[in-house]
A protein has these predicted regions:
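N-terminal localization/anchoring segments of enzymes in phospholipid and broader phosphate metabolism
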Residues: 1-264, 268, 272, 296, ...
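Conserved SAM-binding loop
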Residues: 65, 279, 337
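Glycine- and other small-residue-rich loops at beta-strand/loop junctions that grip anionic moieties
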Residues: 92, 282-283, 317
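A general structural signal for well-ordered alpha-helical packing
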Residues: 263, 270, 291, 304, ...
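Helical hairpin unit composed of two closely spaced alpha helices linked by a short loop
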Residues: 273, 283-304, 309, 314
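C-terminal structural cap/anchor segments
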Residues: 302-306, 310-363
């Protein structure tokens, strides 16, 4: 479903980079044996990401989950200030303000100190938030910069293929991802739709390599720079052993192949759920397979809860999101709306065992059209941190009862019409 075919030129260039990176994607088989001894179901998910999508799972990685942008941001600044060798950043939206201003000041300083600073931003995501050809301005400051898939004044389906990832890698051993873009509303420095609820995760250790691979893949497709990737490995600038608990597997999704990785990860988690499944998503625009999986989970006794916004950022998309409520609710799925405002987080947690935190919305664009990323977590402390955040968020949210779902004929008609255009929204 959806367009999974960006330009042939971009596809060819990324495939060339992938050939160079192939030897750096090897899976430690002893880790697979360990996981198989614990849980064969989780092993299937892990092997899918490792064998088919080529993102290995790692131990020796410490994770820290952030339940808000304002908790994530100071730690991000602190880690940026520690950079000694390189900083890689890949973001969908950059908007001038306090958040980007504080980060940019550090990036300029680090570039002057000889740190390799590279920045990728999506040209469409930042179309209305950055000056035209902003990358030239950053290059003058010593920051290597590329705008992904530049917007052109012609109608093209390729414009749908956006880089929706949020990745920060510092010296190969520290990484960040999640839903947080580089704009003030994400840290509640500026109010747009009530309180802005978002989440992020920091990795320290070997699993950061998968985030680095994602960045290097697109960067070198746009600007061929690297032939030797050894210096970007986690242990290159951190020869000491890493601490860690549990298993960590960052993964990417792209419209370059026929694998709907983001959707498959979600489906695997939903289908394996036995006790509970909690999910955050700003948009709930899903296909029949996802609807069936969620409904079946609820029907077999799983406590399925989904949190969407109370105050939307896009009213038409929100109306479409609400059109899915009744079918899910009738099957036993509990729908909540985040009362304080807008929830932009993209998380799923299940049975105190597994969770995923990343950039992937439950909508057609994220699942089929965009470059995305997430982190699959198994038996880490962060899994329970996501669960606790979900419980606290649900307490602040409004449970959508059948009474609240009642609406008039014309709204039902409008939602039915919107459903026809769901893949475009």
């Amino acid at each position: 479903c959806g367009n999974k075919k960006p330009t042939r030129k971009l596809r060819r260039k990324i495939e060339q980079v992938d050939t160079l990176l192939e030897e750096y994607r090897k899976q430690d088989k002893t880790i697979l044996k360990e996981i198989g001894a614990f849980d064969k179901g989780v092993l299937g998910q892990v092997k899918y990401l490792s064998n088919i999508v080529k993102f290995p799972i790692y131990k020796n990685t410490r994770t820290q989950y952030f339940e808000s942008g304002e908790k994530n941001f100071p730690v991000m600044l602190q880690e940026l200030k520690k950079a000694k060798h390189f900083i890689f950043m890949e973001y969908f939206i950059i908007h001038d303000g306090r958040m980007w201003g504080d980060i940019l000041e550090i990036l300029k300083q680090k570039a002057k100190q000889g740190v390799e600073v590279r920045l990728l931003y999506d040209d469409f995501g930042s179309l209305t938030t950055l000056p035209y050809q902003y990358y030239k301005e950053l290059e003058e400051c010593g920051i290597h910069c590329e705008a992904f898939n530049p917007v052109v004044p012609i109608l093209s389906i390729v414009m749908n293929n956006r880089d929706h990832r949020k990745i920060l890698v510092i010296d190969g051993h520290t990484g960040f991802t999640g839903g947080i873009n580089l704009s003030d509303e994400y840290i509640n420095e500026k109010e747009r739709f009530g309180y802005w609820k978002d989440t992020g995760i920091m990795l320290k250790g070997e699993a950061v390599w998968n985030l680095t691979l994602m960045f290097l893949e697109i960067w070198n497709a746009l600007r061929p720079t690297d032939q030797n990737f050894e210096e970007f490995l986690p242990h290159h600038y951190h020869p000491e052993p890493f601490e860690g608990d549990g298993y960590v597997q960052p993964y990417g999704d792209s419209p370059l192949d026929e694998e709907t990785v983001g959707e498959n990860v979600y489906l695997n988690i939903i289908n394996a759920a036995q006790e509970y499944l909690y999910a955050f998503t700003p948009y709930l625009i899903i296909d029949n397979e996802m609807i069936t999986a969620l409904c079946l989970a609820a029907k077999r006794g799983v406590d399925v809860r989904i949190v969407t916004p109370q105050i939307p950022d896009k009213k038409t998309v929100f109306c479409l999101t609400q059109s899915y409520y009744r079918q899910l609710s009738e099957a036993g799925v509990k729908i909540y709306q985040f009362t304080p405002g807008f929830i932009h987080a993209k998380c799923m947690v299940c049975d105190d065992k597994v969770a995923t935190v990343g950039t992937i919305n439950l909508d057609y664009r994220s699942l089929y059209l965009h470059f995305e990323c997430g982190v699959f977590l198994y038996q880490t402390k962060s899994v329970l941190a996501v669960k606790e955040d979900a419980k606290k968020t649900i307490e602040k949210s409004t449970f959508i009862t059948p009474e609240l779902m009642k609406q008039g004929f014309f709204k039902n008609l409008w939602q039915a019409i919107l459903r026809l255009f769901a893949p475009l929204m």
